[in-house]
């Protein structure tokens, strides 16, 4: 893949990642509806995923000035596949076909997936503001992992 093709794919990949974050936020919103006693937990995660989508959108706007091309190791199709998985999980939640433990396990899988991390590792930037946004995304995702891990450890029959 030449440099021009990489630069062409970068805005597409960022848009897909933004859509992926919005899909995750919607999934967590479904979980909040499905598990009302845990709604606060899920709604907090959903709001934070919406913030991630905003940050990724901001990265897209900064693209022309400060981001270099993503490496050829990353495929927009990988993001699309992952987003399809998230949509399937939302459909399952709407059918009320899962337990709280299954929702937490799915969330853990989503939060620990390498899709976002690998992408951002390939975005060297000359702009300190963009670098801060990428660092904040990494930090926030790590927080989500800790929150979900804590909920998984707490989650026993009759507790959350």
Predicted stretch roles:
Residues 1-160:
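Non-heme di-metal
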């Amino acid at each position: 893949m030449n440099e021009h093709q990489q630069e062409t794919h970068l805005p597409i990949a960022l848009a897909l990642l933004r859509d992926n974050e919005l899909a995750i936020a919607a999934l967590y919103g479904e979980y909040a509806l499905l598990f009302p006693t845990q709604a606060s937990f899920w709604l907090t995660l959903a709001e934070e995923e919406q913030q991630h989508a905003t940050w990724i959108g901001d990265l897209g706007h900064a693209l022309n000035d400060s981001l270099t091309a993503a490496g050829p190791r990353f495929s927009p199709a990988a993001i699309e596949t992952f987003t399809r998985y998230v949509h399937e999980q939302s459909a399952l939640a709407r059918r009320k076909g899962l337990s709280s433990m299954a929702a937490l396990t799915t969330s853990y899988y989503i939060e620990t997936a390498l899709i976002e991390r690998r992408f951002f590792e390939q975005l060297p930037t000359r702009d300190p503001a963009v670098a801060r946004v990428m660092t904040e995304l990494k930090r926030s995702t790590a927080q989500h992992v800790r929150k979900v891990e804590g909920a998984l450890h707490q989650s026993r029959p009759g507790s959350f």
